[in-house]
Amino acid sequence: MLQGRREAKKSYALFSSTFFFFFICFLSSSSAELTDKGVNFEVVALIGIKSSLTDPHGVLMNWDDTAVDPCSWNMITCSDGFVIRLEAPSQNLSGTLSSSIGNLTNLQTVLLQNNYITGNIPHEIGKLMKLKTLDLSTNNFTGQIPFTLSYSKNLQYLRVNNNSLTGTIPSSLANMTQLTFLDLSYNNLSGPVPRSLAKTFNVMGNSQICPTGTEKDCNGTQPKPMSITLNSSQNKSSDGGTKNRKIAVVFGVSLTCVCLLIIGFGFLLWWRRRHNKQVLFFDINEQNKEEMCLGNLRRFNFKELQSATSNFSSKNLVGKGGFGNVYKGCLHDGSIIAVKRLKDINNGGGEVQFQTELEMISLAVHRNLLRLYGFCTTSSERLLVYPYMSNGSVASRLKAKPVLDWGTRKRIALGAGRGLLYLHEQCDPKIIHRDVKAANILLDDYFEAVVGDFGLAKLLDHEESHVTTAVRGTVGHIAPEYLSTGQSSEKTDVFGFGILLLELITGLRALEFGKAANQRGAILDWVKKLQQEKKLEQIVDKDLKSNYDRIEVEEMVQVALLCTQYLPIHRPKMSEVVRMLEGDGLVEKWEASSQRAETNRSYSKPNEFSSSERYSDLTDDSSVLVQAMELSGPR
C-alpha cells in the first residue's frame, strides 16, 4: 500500500515535471514573436516603418501600435500568422524606409515602387532570408546599393531602377544564385559592372559605369551608358600582339564597327525608353516546365487548377464575362482563388507574346487593382489565377441585401477612380481598361473597390495594331467614339466610369436607366433632366430611403455627367475625376462645361439639329447614343 503511494507520488512528480517542462517550452515558443512587454515584434517593426513614412492618403491608417496581430492591416499579407508580404506601391508615400523592416524576418515580398520615399535603402534588408521579391523602383532613394542584399540568398526579383542611387554596383550581387531579374537602370551608379547570374540584367541609364566589368579598365577610360545581358562568359583578352600592320588595321576596323553597333543599339534602347517608358527584358527559356515563376507570377499546372475547381464544375462558377468564365477554387494549401478561363485564345499571339503581356499586367500593382497571382497555359487553354474576392462585384452587391450604404458607395467610387488613375497615369506601361463597369469592380473583405479585368482586352487583341478596331465592352458602358470607330483611349474608360457612378447612385444597371413608365428617354437624358429640375431624390436608389447626403449626391451626379460628355476632349482625365470626388475643382469644371453647352446652343439655329448641339453631352444627344448601343448588341 505504502509502496503504491510512493509510486503514485513518483508518477505524479514525473507528470508534473514533464507538464511544467512542456509548458515552459510552449511559453518560450509563443513568446518568440513577443517583446518583454508582450508586444508582437512584427507589430513593432511595422509601426516603425509607418512612423518613418508620410502617408497622405491614410492607407496605413489601421496600422495600430496597440494591436496584437497585424494580419488584418491594409497592405499586409500573412501566412500562418506571420507577415510575408508588404505591398504599398503607388500610394504617394514619402519619408524614409525604416531599418525596422529587417525585423520582419518572414517577409517574402516587398513592393514599394512608384512612391516618393527618400534616404538610403536600409542595410537591414539583408536580414530577410526568405525574401524573394524586392521592388523599390521609381522612388527617390539615395546612397549606395547595400552590399547586404547578397545575404538574402532566396532573392529572385530585384528592382531599384529610377532612383538616385550612387556608388558602385556591389560585386557580391554576382554571388546571388537565385536571382533571375535585376534592374538597376536610371540611377547614378559608377564603376565596373560585376558579372551577374541574373538572366535579365538592366543597367541602362547609368552614365558612369564601365562597360568591360573590371576596375582596371575603368581607369583612364571614358564611361559609356549601357544595357546588357550578362549570361555569357566574357571574352578573354589575348596576351600576344598583332603579327603585322594589316592584321592590326583589320582588327581596328572590326572593333570600330562593333563599337558603332553597340552605340546604335544603345541609342535604340534609349529611344524606346523615351517613347515607351519601359523596355521589358524577358526570358522564357523554361516555359515548358509545369510550374515556374514569371516575375511575380506563378505558373500553375493545369491539373492543379482542374482539381482546385472540381474540374471547372458549374457549382464553382461565380461569374461570366466577355473574356471568359470565372471559377472559385481551393488550392492544396487551403488558399481560395478565382480562376478565369479565357475565351478566344486562338485569336491572340503566341506563347511568348502572351506571357510578355502577362508580365506587363503583373507589374501593375495598386491597392485598388486586382492582383494577378498566376497563370496556366496549355495547347488549348489559357487561365488566369487571382485572389478570390469574397464580397463579389459592385453589380451583384447593388442587388443584394443588406443594401450598400451611401458612405460605402462613395468609398467604392473613389477607390475605383484611384485604380483607373494608376492604370492611366502612373502604371508603366500605361493600360486602358476598355470595359469599366460595376461587374468589373470587385469588393475585398473590407468593401474596398478593386478594379478587375484590366489589361485583358489587349491580352486577347495583341495581333492587332495599337489602335484597336475590335470593340470590347458592355452595352450601356461603351463610349460613342469607341462604338463608332473602334478607337479606344483613356477617355473611353472615363466614359465608362461616369456610367459606373450613375449605377452607384441609382442602384440600376446602365440599360435599366430611364425605362420606367414615367422615365422616357435614355440614361443621360433622364439624369440631366432631373438634375436641372433639382429632383435628385428621383435618381437615388430607393433602397437608400433618406439615408444619404443630398449635396454629395448632386456632386457625384455632376462628376458623372462630366465624365460622359459626348466628345472625348471635353471629358476630364482620371486624375481630375479623382480630385473632384475628393472635393477639389468640381465647381470650376462644371461651370466651364455649362458655359460651353450654352455657347453651343446660342450658335444653333432654331429647329435645327446642329452638330455642336448634337455632340455636346449637356444637350439632348444621349438617346441617340444609347439606341446605337442597343442596336449593336452584346459583344
Swiss-Prot record:
Ranges where the record places region Disordered: 214-242, 593-621
Phosphotyrosine sites (modified residues): 482
**Which InterPro entries does the record match to this protein?**
Kinase-like_dom_sf (IPR011009), Leu-rich_rpt (IPR001611), LRR_dom_sf (IPR032675), LRR_N_plant-typ (IPR013210), Prot_kinase_dom (IPR000719), Protein_kinase_ATP_BS (IPR017441), Ser/Thr_kinase_AS (IPR008271)
Q: What is its main location?
A: membrane
- Which residues are reported to be glycosylated? 92, 103, 140, 162, 175, 188, 219, 231, 235
Q: Name one GO molecular function term.
A: protein serine/threonine kinase activity
Annotated Gene Ontology cellular components are: plasma membrane
Cite the Protein kinase domain residue spans from the record.
312-591
Positions on the Cytoplasmic side per record topology = 270-635
Q: What is this protein called?
A: Protein NSP-INTERACTING KINASE 2
Q: Which organism is it from?
A: Arabidopsis thaliana (Mouse-ear cress)
